[in-house]
């Protein structure tokens, strides 16, 4: 389930972002143009020779106004904390610098796999210059040009060779979930409170592909859960811990590892832009989503309308998460925390739900009878049949005479009718229009 993480590290102007975009290529998917669904390129999914992985551009993380060398060191620390493999990018035009040497020493001591990319080797004459980089003690330097795509195959071959073996995780039958959100919404308190409620902790196990600690526990009814990356949430004192981009990156990593994500909001502070960015990534990833409003106990002037008003605000600001259940909790007083495991399990089951084709088509035909298909330029959309082709998230192919005739509003109507007929609360569902051959 969890993709390996590759971090790109290096001093400014060596071409980190260009290399990042070259590897990510067109694989950064834009699902829909919806307000709040961000397109930040600090994090992307990529693939090479059938190996899927996630990339983080540490250079995109804003780390205060520290001196340059301090910033680069902090990039290296982030990469060491988060990544399975590190691409250290240097620049053939400037040769080996003091900054390169200091960061190389940090990376070398980390015992994390490091692949050294010497960038801007735009012509064969520059290839001989890369041998100076053996002095960094990081093994073979790979000559690349991220602008022209030269040497990318050899570089990526070296990267995927370092990926960890995930085979040991195949038999894990627990539900993986995580709390995600911006700093100071109470994720750490929720983690501790949940583990306090569920005292039967099975084990603390090393994460599948990295050093983070995932906590497994079992509820009284025997359901097994794995809380993803609790160690990462508990880490304190890092100079970059409260930067927005680092928080966003950590959330995206947790999303990758989870069946269900719990987007945590702070009842005291309301909804911020970063909340919407993080929730947008959860939506795009296609995992199960629950919205958790924490610190509900801190609102002193509550009445019977307060929860309704806050719910309406969430539905307005997170329109793309209309399917996500909302729960109001307090990590401090334990209010409603006992409901969370059951809600997580429910969303997990909806995320894996499969509908028989005959039953699905009855729903589609009833929907079309109640609201006939639209016409465009004298041509009417014809819906022949539908079938479910995947779960996690549930994905349906709808066979039609011409996909161009399926207006977005009618597609949304069909989705709503499917949701009315079957309980898919907490999970996105995808409809794919396909022309019948």
Curated annotation (Swiss-Prot):
Offer an example of a GO molecular function term for this protein. ribosome binding
- In this protein, which residues make up the domain named EngA-type G? 4-167, 175-352
- Which superkingdom, per the lineage? Bacteria
| Record-listed GTP 1 binding positions | 10-17, 57-61, 119-122
Q: Which residues form the KH-like domain?
A: 353-437
PROSITE patterns per the UniProt record, alphabetical: G_ENGA
Q: Which InterPro entries does the entry link to?
A: G_ENGA (IPR031166), GTP-bd (IPR006073), GTPase_Der (IPR016484), KH_dom-like (IPR032859), KH_dom-like_a/b (IPR015946), P-loop_NTPase (IPR027417), Small_GTP-bd (IPR005225)
Protein family (similarity comment): Belongs to the TRAFAC class TrmE-Era-EngA-EngB-Septin-like GTPase superfamily. EngA (Der) GTPase family.
> What's the stated role of this polypeptide?
GTPase that plays an essential role in the late steps of ribosome biogenesis.
- The molecule here is called GTPase Der
> Which taxonomic lineage does the organism of this UniProt entry have?
Bacteria, Bacillati, Bacillota, Bacilli, Lactobacillales
Q: What gene is behind this protein?
A: der
């Amino acid at each position: 389930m969890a993709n390996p993480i590759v971090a790109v590290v290096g001093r400014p102007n060596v071409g980190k972002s260009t290399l990042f975009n070259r590897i990510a290529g067109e694989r950064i998917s834009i699902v829909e143009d919806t307000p709040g669904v961000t397109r930040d390129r600090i994090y992307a999914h990529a693939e090479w020779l059938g190996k899927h992985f996630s990339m983080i551009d540490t250079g995109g993380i804003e780390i205060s106004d520290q001196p340059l060398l301090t910033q680069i060191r902090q990039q290296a620390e982030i990469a060491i904390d988060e990544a399975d493999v590190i691409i250290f990018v240097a620049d053939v035009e400037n040769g080996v610098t003091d900054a390169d040497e200091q960061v190389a020493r940090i990376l070398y001591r980390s015992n994390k796999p490091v692949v050294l990319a010497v960038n801007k080797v735009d012509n064969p004459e520059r290839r001989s210059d890369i041998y100076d980089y053996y002095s960094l003690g990081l093994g073979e330097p790979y000559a690349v040009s991220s602008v022209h795509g030269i040497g990318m195959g050899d570089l990526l071959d070296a990267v995927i060779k370092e990926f960890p073996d995930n085979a040991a995780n195949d038999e894990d039958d627990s539900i993986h979930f995580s709390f995600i959100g911006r700093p100071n919404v109470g994720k750490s308190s929720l983690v501790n409170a949940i583990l306090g409620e569920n005292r039967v902790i099975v084990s603390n196990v090393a994460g599948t592909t990295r050093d983070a600690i995932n906590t497994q526990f079992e509820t009284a009814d025997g359901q097994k859960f794995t809380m993803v990356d609790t160690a990462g949430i508990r880490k304190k004192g890092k100079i970059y811990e409260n930067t927005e981009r680092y928080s966003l990156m950590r959330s995206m990593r947790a999303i990758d590892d989870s069946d269900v994500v719990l987007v945590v909001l702070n009842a005291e502070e309301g909804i911020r832009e970063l909340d919407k960015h993080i929730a947008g990534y959860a939506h795009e990833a296609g995992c199960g989503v629950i919205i958790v409003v924490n610190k509900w106990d801190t609102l002193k002037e509550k009445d019977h309308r307060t929860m309704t008003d806050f719910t309406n605000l969430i539905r307005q600001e997170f329109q793309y998460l209309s399917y996500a259940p909302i729960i109001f909790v307090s990590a401090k007083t334990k209010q409603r925390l006992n409901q969370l495991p059951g809600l997580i399990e429910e969303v997990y089951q909806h995320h894996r739900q499969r509908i028989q084709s005959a039953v699905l088509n009855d729903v589609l035909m009833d929907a079309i009878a109640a609201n006939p298909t639209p016409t465009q330029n004298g041509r009417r959309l014809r819906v022949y049949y539908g079938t479910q082709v995947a779960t996690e998230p549930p994905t349906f192919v709808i066979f039609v005479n011409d996909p161009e005739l399926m207006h977005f509003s009618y597609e949304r109507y069909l989705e709503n009718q499917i949701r009315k007929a079957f309980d898919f609360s907490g999970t996105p569902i995808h409809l794919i229009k396909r022309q019948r051959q």
